[in-house]
Amino acid sequence: MINILNAIILGIVQGITEFLPISSSGHLLLFRHFMHLKLPIIFDIYLHLATVLVIIIYYRQRILELFLTFIRFSLRKTNKSDLTNLKLILLILIITIVTGVVGTFISKYERMFILPFILINFIITGILILMLEFNFFKIDFKGNILLVGIFIGLMQGLGAFPGISRSGITIFSAVSLGFNRKSAFEISFLSLIPIVFGAILFKYKEFYDIFMVLNFFEINLGALVAFVVGIISINFFFKMLNNKKLYYFSIYLFALSITFCCFFRI
């Protein structure tokens, strides 16, 4: 059973790691392992909901722009200036569908989410960040939005594996396709909104059950802490992204994995 201290710690972990390319799900499982907490995966999704609210607030103007563009499109009153937004809406839709399919498949193998597997994924994430930082990988789909969406969706779906950073692998995918970092960051987090809400709908019964099984106050406290810390974290990541210092996160992930392997004999 989760207590107040556990809730605060997990909330801080989620708030910090959601917007950093170091895998929030991997860190949550890592902390839960050492706190001897056995919590349903839907609890993690609930914490993700809190940080999604941060994204909605941070991107509120952009989301409003996209919404108004969609309304104009529905009323057949679009203009040339709406074309870019319509492409982004379509891209996010494709990414969401593909990510949902991949994520649903991966969720069937939750028993594989053990510590050694997570540490290996941390190393993979660290390598991807280095490849992103030094523009090591490029691919060209000639502007084909369907192929672009499928590729990013497939890669983002792999973020369902704990230890694989969803934001990291999505930004890596977008940049490798030619998007600039700011656009890649936008795609990564705007596409997270429908994915998290979709996960809640997909697991709606489990979502209801966590309030029956776990302490109502503690789980909401954890979500509140994740929200507050997330507001700070998202601004910090933007600065790191713009300063091209993401390789620090690779160093951290490599050090974390090696430390656990050496000192805890994993």
From Swiss-Prot:
Gene Ontology biological-process entries: cell wall organization; peptidoglycan biosynthetic process; regulation of cell shape; response to antibiotic
One Gene Ontology term of the molecular function aspect: undecaprenyl-diphosphatase activity
EC nos: 3.6.1.27
Catalytic activity: di-trans,octa-cis-undecaprenyl diphosphate + H2O = di-trans,octa-cis-undecaprenyl phosphate + phosphate + H(+)
Membrane topology: Multi-pass membrane protein
Keywords carried by this UniProt record: Antibiotic resistance, Cell inner membrane, Cell membrane, Cell shape, Cell wall biogenesis/degradation, Hydrolase, Membrane, Peptidoglycan synthesis, Transmembrane, Transmembrane helix
Source domain of life: Bacteria
Hydrolase keyword on record: yes
Pfam families hit by this protein: BacA
Top class in the EC scheme: hydrolase
Keyword RNA-binding annotated: no
More details: Bacitracin is thought to be involved in the inhibition of peptidoglycan synthesis by sequestering undecaprenyl diphosphate, thereby reducing the pool of lipid carrier available.
HAMAP family (alphabetical): Undec_diphosphatase
NCBIfam families for this protein: PRK00281.3-3 (NF001396), undec_PP_bacA (TIGR00753)
Entry function: Catalyzes the dephosphorylation of undecaprenyl diphosphate (UPP). Confers resistance to bacitracin.
Family of the protein in this entry: Belongs to the UppP family.
Name assigned to this protein: Undecaprenyl-diphosphatase
